[in-house]
């Protein structure tokens, strides 16, 4: 019988789940998009991807007893590449949403909120989110942050008789920060888990506004029919949480403690509840 790559990955996962000593010779192909520091970024000296996701994947591979090969994949192509079998799973801090769960399954490994950043020199514009009603705000169009801001703006700006936020799409978070530096926007919206790192490498440049909103989970994307791989990833992550390796990686990459998941989750639910 001839198997397609996706079918082989599922078969391999079932065998690994059934036999604790079993290991597949085939590498797991892991997709990622290096434009989200410090979760995943490109080292300018080597051109290689580095960051939390890279170290996290290495620990997962060691725990699972498999080898992984990274495949740089544009963010918008991560789900299609998973569906066609070009990837076994992906790591790119993608938000776990009900809409996306129609197409894949998430093993959640981080959590984050949405927070505004402004130039420190322009922080006098306001200290609360409401102060930015009517202002121009950049956000990555590849994420659900734009929808979150528009929803918040409808509720807290429009309903209060204030002008709605003018949320504009950016190519990614790097582009959004560039628009802010060039004074093309008044603020930018960023996942809160990445802000401490950005403030560390660009000291004094950016200031946060108010507290994060809309905390949500971010997950590893896995094919919905590859239940064995979902379980293997969930079990490996739980072991890393239990023995402290997960917390050590968060600290290494300066991710805030609130970014940690309390337990290994699947589709934002405890795996035991599925």
What does each of the following model-derived ranges do?
Residues 26-93, 102, 169, 232-233, ...:
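Extracytoplasmic small-molecule ligand-binding "clamshell" domains
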Residues 34-36, 111-118, 199-238, 255-274:
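Periplasmic-binding protein-like
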Residues 35, 45-48, 95-96, 119-124, ...:
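Short coil/turn segments
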Residues 43, 57-64, 145-169, 199-203:
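Ligand-binding cleft/hinge of the Venus flytrap
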Residues 54-63, 122, 129-144, 219-258:
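Extended ligand-binding regions for polar small-molecule ligands
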Residues 58, 62, 67-131, 206, ...:
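Acidic, polar ligand-binding/catalytic clefts
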Residues 77-80, 94-102, 148-152, 181-215:
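A ligand-binding cleft/hinge motif common to bilobed small-molecule-binding domains
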């Amino acid at each position: 019988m001839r198997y397609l790559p996706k079918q082989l990955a599922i078969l391999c996962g079932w065998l690994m789940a059934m036999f604790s000593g079993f290991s597949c010779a085939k590498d797991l192909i892991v997709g990622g998009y290096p434009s989200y520091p410090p979760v995943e970024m490109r080292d300018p000296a080597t051109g290689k991807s580095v960051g939390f996701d890279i170290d996290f994947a290495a620990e997962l591979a060691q725990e699972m007893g498999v080898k992984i090969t990274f495949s740089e994949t544009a963010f918008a192509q991560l789900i299609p590449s998973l569906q066609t079998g070009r990837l076994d799973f992906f790591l790119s801090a993608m938000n776990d949403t009900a809409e996306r769960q129609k197409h894949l399954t998430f093993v959640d490994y981080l959590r984050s909120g949405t927070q505004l950043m402004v130039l420190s020199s322009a922080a006098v514009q306001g200290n609360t989110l409401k102060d930015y009603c009517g202002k121009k705000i950049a956000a990555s169009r590849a994420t659900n942050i734009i929808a979150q801001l528009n929803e918040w703006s409808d509720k807290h700006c429009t309903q209060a008789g204030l002008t709605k936020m003018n949320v504009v799409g950016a190519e990614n978070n790097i582009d959004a920060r560039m628009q802010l530096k060039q004074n093309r926007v008044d603020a930018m919206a960023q996942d809160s888990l990445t802000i401490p790192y950005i403030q560390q490498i660009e000291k004094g440049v950016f200031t946060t506004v108010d507290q994060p909103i809309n905390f949500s989970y971010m997950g590893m994307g896995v094919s919905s029919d590859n239940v064995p791989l979902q379980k293997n990833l969930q079990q490996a992550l739980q072991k890393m949480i239990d023995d402290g390796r997960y917390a050590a990686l968060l600290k290494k990459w300066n991710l805030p403690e609130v970014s940690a998941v309390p337990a290994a989750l699947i589709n934002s639910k405890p795996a035991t509840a599925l």
